Amino acid sequence: ISDKILLDVAKITKKFYPNSVTDDFDVNVEQIENIQFKSKVKFGRNVLVGKNVKIGSNCLIGHNSIIETNVSIGDNCTIGSNVIIRNSLIKNNVHILDGCIIGKKGFGFFPDKKANFRYPQIGVVIIEDNVEIGCNSTIDRGSLSNTVIGKNTFLDNQIHIAHNVKIGENCIIAGQVGFAGSSV
């Protein structure tokens, strides 16, 4: 039937999720009234918020941060300055420090002699309760499944979590660590 089953699945998936290969940037300042947020949410200067965003109560979104499409942020969360988040479910008491990028597409390619094919990234990032993510860390959204950071986990600065990675509960991970795609 096919000697490149994963490549064929990727091509079929792309047809159903055409925007999963390119990050369409549809964030607009005027959309801020369309978001759903509870009481006591504070926004820093130059914050942009996209479509389908929910923000819980007692949250702080730092200066110059971008909350793109399809993001849900729980209660008592802090998003630092210069953070970009998209396609993510962030639960309660989560602290994302300055400069992080959460939920962008991962590094998923199928090599082919004609041309490399980017695998669609249709999963999300799930960050469980009581998590802290250090400065300048990156967490890719899942390709066909989700990327998950377990409860009570602390990530130091400059950590990279690739697509589909599952980090367990109560983990403490030191700086400059990288997890390759689909690691558990």
Residue ranges: model-predicted function:
Residues 29-184:
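Structural signal for interior beta-strand "rungs" in well-ordered beta-sheet cores
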Residues 1-33, 39-44:
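Short, basic phosphate-binding NTP loop
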